[in-house]
């Protein structure tokens, strides 16, 4: 009895919230019911609002009458409200009008309960509950203005039906807790017909979802514990290494200068550091240096996996520099310094050679004019032009080689490990872009200097031709008086 009272209270509250006077639904509350009865009896006052309501009452076909049980008894009882409803028989398509009793919202529980629970011959209730289709069919044959949603809600709140629908693989009885479940009702669509198979399916789905939630919560707790311990160990190892790696692009960026030789030296030093670090990481055993070099090349050829986080052992082994690595770094740095000196000497010779050629060209021109030797001036002019062209070609080749070498050194001297953060990658990219812009500016300056030198050469050639022509005419004029 307590479960029935709780069910009545919950269902009644839901009905009043859903189908009350405030909600615009196709239902009839007690207040609206009394107003319709007054309008049909002629006691309702006329107004604009009543005119609309009166039109609605006439369009629906409400009328007063006596219930069937009162008609059989023949006694004069209170009249009830009926409405005309179009019905069809099961065989034909012909429609006919029949009267249905108007169901009041406040009486929904009693109406559905009387149709849902079967009664015995003596009026006693049998513990047999009908399904949704059966209950709604019995209600629709006698009542109107009672939606299917209310029937579905009632069946979902019925504790007896819930016990019957509850799955029991062991065959044991279940205890009635007196409270209908609320989780299932939120998952059900009340506007669709619900069968026993559908209810069992929804029940199984609910049980499976609860089991999945429990398992996922346990697994997530275990994963959080293991992940937190693992990440704390990795972060402690990564902190020092990341700081060193973040400082390296800044130092390289600060040491760059407008001079190409300074940039090449910085690129060589960074390349030496990276090669020494890789050699120190992969060459742990000092006994076999050739095998260490092979393994280093094989590991450099392997692609970097950016998704996997490196372990602490790998990070410490990659960034450990031992004595052998420092010796190799010093040797390699000495070789780079010697190469750098050779490049500087070549560039100094190349830069001095054009000035020397110009001075020799001027001196040759003056000597040819003074002496009047046509062959010597022509030969010297040709030789100076050839030397000047050769110096320009060699200078261009050296410059292009130096630019390509600087690009390769700048590219190879900045290896990007998989664990670098976005800030470090951005700083490396910014330094590379700045060095590239400087190289482009230098190339533009060199091209401009070459373009300015080309017209000067063209001007020198006509002057040489005029000088030779003048020297050729002078001996001719001197020979004429002798002839």
From Swiss-Prot:
Residue ranges with Acidic residues bias: 211-225
InterPro entries from the UniProt entry: HTH_NOL4, NOL4/NOL4L
Pfam families recorded: HTH_NOL4_2nd
Biased composition (Polar residues): 229-254, 262-271, 302-317, 351-363, 467-483
Keywords, comma-separated and alphabetical: Nucleus
Keyword field contains Cytoplasm: no
Residues covered by region (Disordered): 210-418, 435-483
Disulphide bridges: none
GO cellular component, one term: nucleolus
Cell compartments where the protein resides: Nucleus, Nucleolus
Biased composition (Basic and acidic residues): 319-330, 340-350, 364-374, 391-409, 435-451
Keyword NAD: no
PANTHER family: DEATH DOMAIN-CONTAINING PROTEIN (PTHR12449), NUCLEOLAR PROTEIN 4 (PTHR12449:SF17)
The name this protein goes by in its record: Nucleolar protein 4
